[in-house]
Amino acid sequence: QDIAGNQVSAGQTVTVDSSVTLTIDTIAVDDIISDAESQSDVTISGTASTADAGRTVTVTLGGNTYNATVQPDGTWSVDVPAADVQAQSDGELTVTASLTDAAGNAVSVDHLVTLDTTAPVVTINPIATDDIVSAAEAGGLVTLSGTAEANSTVVITIGTLTFNATTNASGVWTTDVSLAALADGDYTANVVATDAAGNSGTTNRPFEM
């Protein structure tokens, strides 16, 4: 209002930017890095706001720091060198991503990933108790059994025959199979166990028909 009593008003819209968008995608497909996957660089990626295109996302893993740039579509990614991954101990690792936007707002998000580079130890018990399958035993079902890491898939190969089993929560596997197709002679049961991370362990057991 001026001295003559005239009044005027003005307005302006102010946008308050107090939030930052930042996510981390699933790592190595299933958030489990196997031994085979650790032999190559591991990609860590995610998304941010398209408004933050060109800004830097700082990623930390196991004490190492890496930088990624937000792309025009809001995505970002960085490759962690295989040597850095292999330097970590098996177990749960925390990946942290941090970003500060143009308004000065900062955000940091964590993502858990499991490093499992240890091949499962697999065993197979004596076949037909004494590793000799008699004619009478061959006429029925023969139990193949053993142990491996819990929840592993097990493939048993004997000559041209292939059988499948799965370990239970205690790591025990068992399957009843027919060996009637095998002629008399010496054979080897080859066993491959693959754990949830994709690591494989092998063993074998000779037996006689």
Task: Report residues per predicted region.
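Short strand-edge motifs at loop-to-beta-strand transitions and within beta-strands
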Residues: 74-78, 171-177
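Short, solvent-exposed loop/edge segments of extracellular or virion-exposed proteins
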Residues: 17-37, 120-137
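Surface-exposed, short loops/turns at beta-strand junctions within beta-sandwich domains
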Residues: 82-92, 178-186
